[in-house]
Amino acid sequence: FFGWLIKGAIHAGKAIHGLIHRRRH
């Protein structure tokens, strides 16, 4: 469960980072 939580957090972080990068670009 903990590993899944971290994996989910990383995925969410990448998604948010991608959205921010797209908005800036």
From Swiss-Prot:
It is found in: Secreted. GO terms for cellular component: extracellular region. Gill. Localized in certain epithelial cells lining the surface of secondary lamellae and eosinophilic granule cell-like cells at the base of secondary lamellae. Keywords: Amidation, Antibiotic, Antimicrobial, Cytolysis, Hemolysis, Secreted. Its main location: secreted. The modification Histidine amide is found at residue 25. The keyword Secreted applies. GO terms for biological process: defense response; defense response to Gram-negative bacterium; defense response to Gram-positive bacterium; hemolysis in another organism. The keyword Secreted applies. This is Chrysophsin-1. It comes from Pagrus major (Red sea bream).
